């Protein structure tokens, strides 16, 4: 029984110390963006980052040229087969 009293006294002492030296708790829920606000912000950022014309993008140009070459090759194969 003595050990329980000592443990209880220690717990109470730790709680009192924690409350007296507690750090200020920030209310993060008020400062955080709601999901809808965050989604709207991300959409705006994505719109700003989108490229107007992908042909000016080096990677898009290379893919476009590869697709064009593939179409030409397929047409030549059809002509030879037909």
UniProtKB/Swiss-Prot annotation:
Expressing tissues: Expressed by the venom gland.
Post-translational modification: Cleavage of the propeptide depends on the processing quadruplet motif (XXXR, with at least one of X being E).
One GO cellular component, as annotated: extracellular region
GO biological process, one term: defense response to bacterium
A Pfam family per the record: Latarcin
Signal peptide: 1-22
Principal location listed in the UniProt entry: secreted
Propeptide: 23-61
Modified residues (Alanine amide): 81
Molecular function as annotated in GO: toxin activity
Compartments, as annotated in UniProt: Secreted
Function: It has antimicrobial activity against Gram-positive bacteria (A.globiformis VKM Ac-1112 (MIC=0.7 uM), and B.subtilis VKM B-501 (MIC=2.9 uM)), Gram-negative bacteria (E.coli DH5-alpha (MIC=23 uM), E.coli MH1 (MIC=28 uM), and P.aeruginosa PAO1 (MIC>45 uM)), and yeasts (P.pastoris GS115 (MIC=23 uM), and S.cerevisiae Y190 (MIC=23 uM)). Does not have hemolytic against rabbit erythrocytes. Causes paralysis, but is not lethal when injected into insect (M.domestica) larvae.
Protein's UniProt name: M-zodatoxin-Lt3b
Source species: Lachesana tarabaevi
């Amino acid at each position: 029984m003595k050990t329980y009293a000592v443990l209880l006294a220690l717990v109470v002492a730790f709680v009192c110390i924690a409350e007296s030296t507690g750090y200020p708790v920030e209310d993060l829920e008020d400062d955080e963006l709601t999901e809808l606000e965050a989604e709207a912000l991300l959409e705006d950022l994505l719109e700003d980052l989108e490229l107007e014309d992908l042909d000016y993008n080096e990677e898009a140009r290379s893919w476009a040229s590869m697709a064009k070459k593939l179409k030409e090759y397929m047409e030549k194969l059809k002509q030879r087969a037909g």
